């Protein structure tokens, strides 16, 4: 049995990042709404509790409180932002509106050598005070400490930026240690979880396989399962895990909608039919998909058509597999969060995800989602532990609608052929080019990155087809051909992203190869937009 950390969600958009930081410390955790019952908290039996941030105001919304059982359990509690404020109010302190609201970077002074912050700082002042570079996002502030608490941290505009009652193991910070902008945030969360709470760091994917296999066997029994295999990381790892558990009780359905990457179908079939000896039904439905996409230019409409046609094709195949009782999906935790479908139901919906909600209930199948509570990095670790090749497991994310949302405007077979070849060349150049000491000296990467491929140094990279033509010259003749844009970003969480500063030589080679090898494209541009304001995908 794993030690568990209970994260109570008060509605913050970054609550899932708290969970990710805890998991990175190899400790299991779950997110649940702040209004769970006292009985639930006691039955959960956490080693510690973390209270999240919120968009709400502590003194205006009196419904957003932690259950009384949190304070009765006798376990350590960490309050973050709003979590600090509700801790203060519930334990006898005072919170009020701040005249100086803080949103963004701040330098915070640590006080009192508490167990949480002792020895953790980014720099020291001339007087020897430890300072932390943190990320703030609050309009209220704790004005009066609860009985038994001492000051733990402060900023010029927030005199009580942290507080602690070490006798009871209660700690609270006004900043957000879960976001990457707080430089020592991960260290602070690890300190709380591992040292203060004393949780065992035994949440390791290699060990998780045995538990997951046992759970799948218990759920499924001797019934059969079907899974839509896309070639992406999530569905591939889900397929490998389920196949490990139940073997030939699993049938994978691989639908080729004509919008896959170059040679993707062959790679998937070679892996699952050839190496894993799994049952795979291969359906070439490219004519059907491209036919329904003809004349459609709106991005959301394209997504809906691709989703609808996939359901139709998959449903037809599922009906042929009459013994199947389960539908398996590669849904992972961020999918659930982004669709506003967390266990808390408090996060605002960001976008509709193609996995969440799944296929229509008319299939009459039970849902099997063995990766639902895992983050992407955990899924990748699991995939490697299951024996999938790293080049498959560590591929960059690929949208469910495939190249359909990387072709701007109407989708045509001609456009898809041009794009997949251009994209393959760009990815090949990224994989084949390693960062050099000169790149590090120029600030394109860190010194520790020297020797790594630029594919591994980017989080997502791809080509985009622009349905416009430009004039060019090749040989002695004039050309009038299409334009493609290259896109590469670096990010830790995909919620924000920076465009990747790739070496000019790499971009030059990719451009020259695309123009020379892909007949029909005569101009290549590079997208230098961050997220925000742009999104990572163009559509």
Swiss-Prot record:
Entries under HAMAP family matching the protein:
GMP_synthase (MF_00344)
Show the catalytic activity: XMP + L-glutamine + ATP + H2O = GMP + L-glutamate + AMP + diphosphate + 2 H(+)
List, for all copies, the residue spans of the domain called GMPS ATP-PPase. 203-395
Oligomeric form and interacting partners: Homodimer.
Q: Which Enzyme Commission number(s) are listed?
A: 6.3.5.2
Q: Which UniProt keywords apply?
A: ATP-binding, Glutamine amidotransferase, GMP biosynthesis, Ligase, Nucleotide-binding, Purine biosynthesis
InterPro entries in the cross-refs:
Class_I_gatase-like, GATASE, GMP_synth_C, GMP_synth_GATase, GMP_synthase, GMPS_ATP_PPase_dom, NAD/GMP_synthase, Rossmann-like_a/b/a_fold
- Entry GO terms, CC: cytosol
**What organism is the protein native to?**
Burkholderia vietnamiensis (strain G4 / LMG 22486) (Burkholderia cepacia (strain R1808))
Q: Where is the Glutamine amidotransferase type-1 domain?
A: 4-202
The residues annotated as the active site are: 81, 176, 178
Q: Which domain of life is it from?
A: Bacteria
User: What pathway is this protein said to act in by its record?
Assistant: Purine metabolism; GMP biosynthesis; GMP from XMP (L-Gln route): step 1/1
One annotated GO molecular function = ATP binding
Q: Which Pfam families match?
A: GATase, GMP_synt_C, NAD_synthase
* Protein name per UniProt: GMP synthase [glutamine-hydrolyzing]
As for what it does, the entry says: Catalyzes the synthesis of GMP from XMP.
